[in-house]
Amino acid sequence: LVYDPDILLLDEPLANLDAKLRRYMRAEIRRIQKATNITTIFVTHDQEEAMAVGDRLAVLRKGIVEQIGTSDELYNVPKNAFVANFIGKMNFFSSKAGKSGDVIECKVANDGPVLFIGKDRAHTEVNAHDDVLVGGRPEHLFVTKEKSEKTIPGKVHIIQHLGSFIRYEVDVDKAISPVTLEIDMDSLQK
């Protein structure tokens, strides 16, 4: 920064710092970026770090750009399964699509409920009986002991208390990988 560069290139600048110092330095780098208005290319394999520091992110796989966008765009509207799972955790399951107007019907597992997903959430044209891959973020799911037509039976096999939230790993069906759920402590208090 002493030489007033046009572009600042940073290759894993926080890689060897402990977690607390990394969080502090993320904020400091962001502050410097804003104060100097300098274009910065920040290479990191830490998705949380990228989302905290970057205005626009590029997700690469084997040297190919998969998606460019804001952290919100990449997290909430990923272009494909790779980006979805790279930017945060995503639970996936395969299903056969059915249609009902402007929604796609997807059955979860053998005993599971039918999800109704808006066609605007699909990344490609989906027709009835197409094989589809459906993804759901851990924070959009919850654990309950009550059975209903909207629940998926499963067995909790790992519980991790991680400060502000609890992460559950749940086996739901032999055909589906264990499902991850994250429930914040505030919602458990209610």
Feature names for model-found ranges:
Residues 1-85:
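ABC ATPase nucleotide-binding domains
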Residues 38, 56, 92-93, 152:
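Structural detector for hydrophobic anchor residues on beta-strands
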Residues 49-53, 61-64, 88-91, 125-126, ...:
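Short low-complexity stretches enriched in small and charged residues
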Residues 62, 96-101:
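Short acidic/glycine-rich beta-turn/loop cap or linker motifs at sensory/regulatory domain boundaries
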Residues 67, 73, 92, 167-168:
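Short, electropositive, low-hydrophobicity segments enriched in small/polar residues
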Residues 70, 82, 94-96, 153-157:
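Residues located in well-ordered beta-strands
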Residues 90, 99-190:
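Non-catalytic connector elements of ABC transporters
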